[in-house]
Amino acid sequence: MRKYPVGIQSFESLRKEGYLYIDKTELIYRLISTGKYYFLSRPRRFGKSLLISTIEAYYSGQKELFQGLFIDGTEKNWISYPILHFDLSAQKYDSAESLYDILNDILAKWEKKYGTEPSEVSLSLRFQGIIQRAAEKAGKGVVILVDEYDKPMLQAIGNDNLQNTYRDTLKAFYGALKSKDQYIQFALLTGVTKFSKVSIFSDLNNLMDISFDKRYAELCGITENEIHTWLEEDLYDLAANTNMSYEQVCTSLKERYDGYHFTEDSNGLYNPFSLLNTFARMKFGNYWFETGTPSYLAQLLKQNKYNLTRLSNEVVTNDLLNGIDTLANSPIPVLYQSGYLTIKDYNSRFNVYTLGFPNKEVEEGFISYLLPYYAHVQPAESAFQIMSFIDEIEKGKIEAFFLRLQSFFADTPYEMIRDLELHYQNVLFILFKLLGFYTEAEYHTSDGRIDLLVKTGKFIYLMEFKLEGTAEEALAQINEKHYAIPFQADGRRIFKIGVNFSSKTRNIQKWIVEEI
C-alpha cells in the first residue's frame, strides 16, 4: 500500500520508511552546484521544511538516502560537512525576550560542541564564533540552513515596536553570514514572506532570492506532469473511492488545488499538502485551509481599508510583490507570499502582474474565513448562516433573507461611519461571493451603488443597493436601466428588489420587492 508523506518533514524518515517522494533532486543539485547563498519564500505547508531536510541529508553525505534519485547518478563525491540548522517554525514569539531566548538556546547547544570565547557576548558574535570554529574543526565549510526565518516577524505584525526589536536582532544575527563568508560552504534561508524595507537582509547583498526565479519555480509544490508520473495509479484509486471518472477526478484536483504561479510564465503548481491529503484519505477536502489561517491577514485587510472586490483582480508591480514593508499601505504582498493570492497574468509592456485566488479551496476558504471579521456573525455560526441564506433564496423567502441580512449589519461600530460605503460593499461582497459558490451570483459596484444578480433553479433576483438614497430610487434604477429585459423569456420567476442603507442606523433601512 502506498505511503503518502502527509506532514513528514524529515527526508531521512521519508526515505527509510518507504514514503512516496517526488524527485526534486535535479533542481536541488542545480541549486547547490551553481551558487552559495539563497533565499526562498513559499506559502506554508508547501514543502520548505522537507527541502531543507533533503539538503541537510545531502551535505551530511547520506548517499544511501538518494538511491534511485537523479542526484544519485550525478554526484560523485559524497562529503559530510558541519551543518547548522535553525528551525524557527515551532516557536512562539510574543515578547522581546522570546526571540533572544530561543536563539540563545540554539547557540548554547552548538557551543557545547564547538566551544566559545569570553569575548563573544552578543548573539551575532557567538554565531560568528561557532561558524568559524565548526569550519576549522572539520577542515571544510559550514552549511547553514534556516527554516521559517520570518516566523518572529510574522507573529509581530501589528506590533511595530516588537517588529523593530526583532528586525534589529535578526539583522545583526544573520549578518554573521557575510562576515564569516570564508567559512561557509552553503546557506539557504526559507520563509513564507520576504521583509524588504525592514532591512533584515539589507547587509546580505550576496543572498540570491530565488522566489521569483523561473529555474526554481517547481522546487516546492507538485506539477501536473509529476502527478501523472508519480501518482497515475492513485488517480484511478481516487476515482473509484469517490464514484467519479478518471477525467472528473483530474478536473476536480485541478480546480481545488492547482493554480499557484510564482513567476509570470511558470507552470501551475498544486498545493502538495492538500494533494497528498486527498490521496491519503481518498476524498476531497479543504486540507490546507483547515490547518489554520493567521488572524493578522484579516486584520491587515481591515486596517488598510482594503476593498475586497479587488481580491480577484488585483494589479500590482513587481516591486510590491517582491517584499513586505510593515509601514506600507498594502496587504497584497503578504497575501501573495502567504499563498492566498497568486499570479494570474503578466503585462510585459507595463511590467505589472494581475493577481487572484489560485484555486477553489483557497477562494472558498478565505472568503468564509473573512465573514466573522466583517459581519455580525460568530465563526461557529458562519456555515449555518450561509446555508440559511441559500435555503431562503432558493425557496423565494425574500423577507426572511433580508431580515437575516439586516442581522449581519447589526452592531456596526460607530467609527465605521467614515468608511460606511466600503463596509457595506465588503460585507455584501463576502456574502454574495459565498452564495456564488452554490448559486449563480454576479456582483458589481460603482458610484455608491451595488448591483446584484442571483440565479437559482426557480428564481432570478435583480437587486440594487443604494448607499445614499431610498429603496424607491434603487428600484427605479432597475427599471430605468432595463436590467430585467435579458431575462424575460427565461421562464423563472423574476424579482426586482430595491434596497437602501441608512447611515444613521448603519444598517439596511428598507427593501421593496416587485415581481415581473
Question: At which residue positions do the language-model features occur?
Answer:
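Active-site metal-binding core of divalent-cation-utilizing nuclease and nuclease-like domains
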Residues: 134-138, 431-457
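Structural motif
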Residues: 143, 459-461, 495
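Domain-level recognition of nuclease-like catalytic cores that cleave nucleotide substrates
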Residues: 486, 492-516
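Metal-dependent nuclease catalytic cores in nucleic-acid-processing enzymes
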Residues: 173-180, 333-341, 429-433, 477-497
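Conserved catalytic cores of phosphodiester-cleaving nucleases, focusing on short active-site segments
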Residues: 428, 452-467, 481
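Mg2+/Mn2+-dependent nuclease catalytic core
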Residues: 163-169, 467-484
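Phosphate-binding site recognition
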Residues: 1-420, 435
